[in-house]
A protein has these predicted regions:
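Conserved alpha-helical substructure of the radical SAM core
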Residues: 2-118, 122-123, 324-325, 329-333
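Residues that line or immediately flank small-molecule/substrate-binding pockets and catalytic motifs
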Residues: 49, 80, 131, 199, ...
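Generic structural signal for helix capping and beta-alpha/helix-loop junctions
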Residues: 52, 85, 113, 136, ...
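Radical SAM enzyme [4Fe-4S]-AdoMet core and its adjacent flexible, acidic
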Residues: 59-60, 99, 123, 128-132, ...
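Short, acidic/turn-prone active-site loops that include or flank metal/cofactor-
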Residues: 109-110, 131-135
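Accessory C-terminal segments flanking Radical SAM cores
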Residues: 226-333
Length: 333
């Protein structure tokens, strides 16, 4: 499926303006981690473990505004931890919308029904709900029975209230294809606006029992494509080809920048070598050439959209790529 036209136009205008201004590294997405506190303890979440000692810290509305102004990205992904635990999350969403941002609020949706009335529907605002499989699979990974049904109820309430809703699903080594198909069918029947997939990534060198190597990702995504196609998937066709091993893409670690109570996360959304005090320090003082597959061993199996979707625009060198993206945007692919 294609992204909404207004979102693609917002991103395209931003990229064009940045290129005309001679900016070499143009982040497209700001991951704004309001807090690392969470009401779940999911097996695959690196954030709540990495920031275990600072979970009580949270960004203020002013800090969030300043980060959005500094990063100057067209898209802001408000996350955590669980952002619906933050008392000012609705005000932060409104601040982002008033700045012209496309906003995704990433949530496990356990508090979505409770806090839904604090938000107003907007064509640039989406709740992005994390679901890793049908009820039995999702509840096992979250460690709390009933989480799937509570999240589903939150999605249903948000859709009925007129909000945009997307989902994000992490695929682990032991995730059966049938469970993903079951989940996708349920979400499609429910009427979500799009579904994202993310291969499970090891945060340190090598993989553990749950994460996937690059060949395993390609095999899984080929099987998913054969069984499901690209129905309702919220990714560009070029990125999906990359996941299936059908094309190469370079990682753009600066394409998605992350700000949280510790500062600007260096170098990227997944890896943490340091936190720096300013966006300028992140962009100008990071040795970007040192990161990515073939450069840093930790990056060898990473295929996450945070680094590779932003490179799609830069990777379109042929007329066929441009035509394929145009067909996708018009709903023809």
């Amino acid at each position: 499926m294609s992204l909404p036209l207004n979102i693609n136009l917002t991103i395209a205008r931003h990229v064009l303006a940045e290129r005309l201004n001679g900016h070499q590294r143009t982040p497209l997405v700001l991951m704004l981690e309001l807090t690392h506190a969470c009401n779940l303890n999911c097996a695959g979440c690196g954030r709540i473990r990495e920031y275990a000692d600072t979970r009580a810290a949270r960004l203020t509305l002013q800090q969030a505004r300043q980060a959005m102004q500094a990063a100057h990205t067209p898209v802001v992904s408000i996350s955590g931890g669980e952002p619906l635990l933050h008392p000012d999350v609705a005000d932060i969403v409104q601040a982002a919308l008033s700045m012209g941002k496309v906003v995704y609020l990433c949530t496990n949706a356990l508090l979505l029904e409770k806090r839904l009335a604090e938000f107003e529907p907007h064509r640039r605002f989406y709740f992005n709900v994390h679901l890793d499989g049908p009820p039995a699979v999702h509840d096992r990974l979250t460690g709390l029975p009933g989480t799937y049904q509570r999240a589903r109820a939150g999605i249903s309430a948000a859709l009925e209230a007129g909000f945009g809703v997307t989902t994000n699903t992490t695929i682990y080594k032991d995730t059966p294809l049938e469970s993903i198909l079951h989940l996708f069918q349920d979400l499609t029947d429910l009427g979500v606006d799009g579904m994202m997939v993310a291969p499970a990534f090891a945060y340190e060198v090598g993989t553990n029992a749950a994460t996937l190597t690059r060949p395993e990702v390609e095999q899984r995504m080929q099987a998913l494509y054969q069984a499901w196609g690209d129905r309702n998937l919220y990714h560009s066709p070029l990125y999906m080809q990359f996941l299936r091993g059908e094309r190469a893409l370079d990682c753009m670690p600066w394409g998605t920048v992350t700000y949280n109570p510790q500062g600007w996360k260096q170098p990227c959304y997944l890896l943490t070598d340091a936190h720096v005090p300013s966006f300028e320090a992140l962009i100008n003082n990071t040795n970007w050439e040192a990161y990515g597959p073939g450069r840093d061993a930790r990056c060898a199996d990473c295929m996450l959209h945070s680094g590779f979707e932003p490179s799609v625009m830069n990777g379109m060198h042929s007329l066929s790529d441009w035509l394929q993206m145009a067909r996708w945007q018009l709903g023809g692919e």
